[in-house]
């Protein structure tokens, strides 16, 4: 079995980490270095942990933290990020989360995995984390059934949503079906919104 390496970073830009996030299904912009840079301008600090195998990132997370009165709060939004081809990594990441919380003297830590993070939630509970219904900084994930014709899709939306779509089209917004080749552009757009 190959040895894993843990790398700690605090820099506000990390193109290697951002590239890793682009390559995995659950990579989210809230974990990208651009998001950390935007939050650092608002007084947050960042600690990024990357787990490497053969000099290649296979998982990690980014903790943002700051002082709030007498305590230090931290959060991991839409993380940890894990390469699906790396089973067993979750246990290592949770240990690193606890270590980083202690190292950075974080009193209260919110870990908010991705929507597909059911195994992460279970592993966190097994390791002493308590469930809480706190919301992340951005709660804007939407799942939309796009099966059927465009008319079918629109008919499943509320009247007000359909009205806003028509207004947007009148203002020049173009709607088209995306392709796999558009994903990198979409991810870049999400990163640019963090700047």
Which residue ranges define each predicted feature?
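N-acyltransferase acceptor-side catalytic subdomain
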Residues: 1-195
